[in-house]
């Protein structure tokens, strides 16, 4: 609901929003050179907010074999599905990564009615804050599988399972 509210506010605001755009240069004269989907664009501004964002690691960037079936999402994709489209990403969920975002997403999946099979973490301990570990995993009885990784995706067209490997 917060995301939908922000989108609505931005649509009605007297501001210019540039998505998927790189700032090539900024000057003290309040001008910027941008490179975006429409190409090169010089702009002048009174105020400028740079929201640099980030890039998520996709499953394709990890050494995982198997097909690339539907049903594998980044945290950002899952959040968009839930927050903006009100779609549940699946009935059964496995979260890869125990940083704060992974912990919070695991809890959110439970609240959305998903069965969270666990949170998989390559390192030997949880990567998130202790309070998030307690409130997200322990309170919802979600298992944390440390020193573990996903090595294979199963399914033709749709994800049907994964192979996990313990790293010890």
Stretches found by the model and what they are:
Residues 1, 49-50, 116-121:
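Short beta-strand "acidic-cap" motif of Rossmann-like dinucleotide-binding folds
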Residues 2-92, 167-168:
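FAD-binding core/adjacent interface of flavoenzyme oxidoreductases
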Residues 7-34, 43, 110-168:
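A Rossmann-like FAD-binding core segment of flavoenzymes
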Residues 56, 100-102, 126, 151-152:
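Glycine-rich nucleotide phosphate-binding loop and flanking beta-alpha elements
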Residues 59-61, 104-106, 155-156:
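Short glycine-/acidic-enriched loop or helix-start segments at secondary-structure transitions
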Residues 72, 101-105, 133:
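Short amphipathic alpha-helical patches
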Residues 77-125:
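Rossmann-like NAD(P)H-binding beta-loop-alpha module
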């Amino acid at each position: 609901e917060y995301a939908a509210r922000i989108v609505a506010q931005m649509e009605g605001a007297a501001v210019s929003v540039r998505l998927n755009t790189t700032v090539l240069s900024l000057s003290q004269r309040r001008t910027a050179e941008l490179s975006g989907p429409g190409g090169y664009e010089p702009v002048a501004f009174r105020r400028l907010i740079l929201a640099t964002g980030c890039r998520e690691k996709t499953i394709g960037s990890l050494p995982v074999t198997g097909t690339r079936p539907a049903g594998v999402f980044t945290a950002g994709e899952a959040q968009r599905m839930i927050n903006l489209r009100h779609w549940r990403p699946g009935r059964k969920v496995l979260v890869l990564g125990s940083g704060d975002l992974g912990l919070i997403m695991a809890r959110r999946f439970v609240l959305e009615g998903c069965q969270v099979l666990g949170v998989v973490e390559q390192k030997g301990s949880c990567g998130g804050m202790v309070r998030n570990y307690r409130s997200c995993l322990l309170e919802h009885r979600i298992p944390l599988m440390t020193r573990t990784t996903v090595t294979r995706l199963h399914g033709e067209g749709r994800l049907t399972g994964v192979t996990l490997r313990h790293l010890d």
